[in-house]
């Protein structure tokens, strides 16, 4: 396999760091040390500090008996000085062989001024894992500049909305009434909510799974969504008779009794979204949703427009919030960075990486 990040090879300072640091994957018995680092140097009362269940769901690697974190442990003091957490789809289905890495927490202590310490963690994981794709969603300006320096493809994550235009008042969003009313597409498919058992019964030869990402699998969606410890996701099968053409994976979000539906992942050809316009509208009416939104990278804009999903940036003054824990009524513009050795087109959704992760405990929401 090609090296996904050859720019880090031959860096003398990385080799020299081994004299002072033990750089490796985080052991299970170092959980308390890592969580203390996150709480003290990354974010106070982070969800991983508050919930070991959530941390284990995302980072506990039972296959390798470790956590999916690389740490730099100072040999003299025994303290963690830097950490790099990552998410893989392989984590949710070990049968997935091409490995995609989603960088998550990447932090070096502010008081530690050691050249290349954080970069050395990147070097370690790419030397110890057969990485095909490194993709980061929702990254800081500092991280973005580093990824650009390394030759990553970068850009803005797109945010689309399908409005409920039958409401007189909106609370979660602003100026959604400025979206021009469009003629609805005919519903050529039937949208049916399905549970885990019904999902598992869908044949592997169905069209929906012929369009699945090489980094995901049928089992991945079970482990990632149906077995989530805190969030409740809903699956909608888009059916043509008995055949499943696509599946919408979504989660209800809200604030003070006002609600929306967020499509966090999608299996199949995105053009099929345009074949259930009326049923999506009926769903919004039934559930009192202000809108349905979709955050993505890589889908065809024309296909989403044809499905009557509108890019929020195309409507002046339109505000569609991205943060609900806690709720912030403002637009959020997120960057992405991607580096791959595969020729396959990559499409990402909100639930990729750790973007659709709780920030608060359930009783605080």
Descriptions of predicted regions:
Residues 20:
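Double-stranded DNA-binding cores of transcription factors and transposases
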Residues 48, 65, 96, 118, ...:
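Active-site-proximal structural scaffolding
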Residues 69, 80-83, 100, 131-135, ...:
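Beta-sheet entry/capping signal
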Residues 92-98, 112-116:
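Alpha-helix boundary/capping segments in eukaryotic regulatory proteins
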Residues 2-14, 88, 132-183, 234, ...:
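Active-site/acyl-donor-binding loops of N-acyltransferases
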Residues 97-110, 257-269:
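Conserved acetyl-CoA binding element of GNAT-fold acetyltransferases
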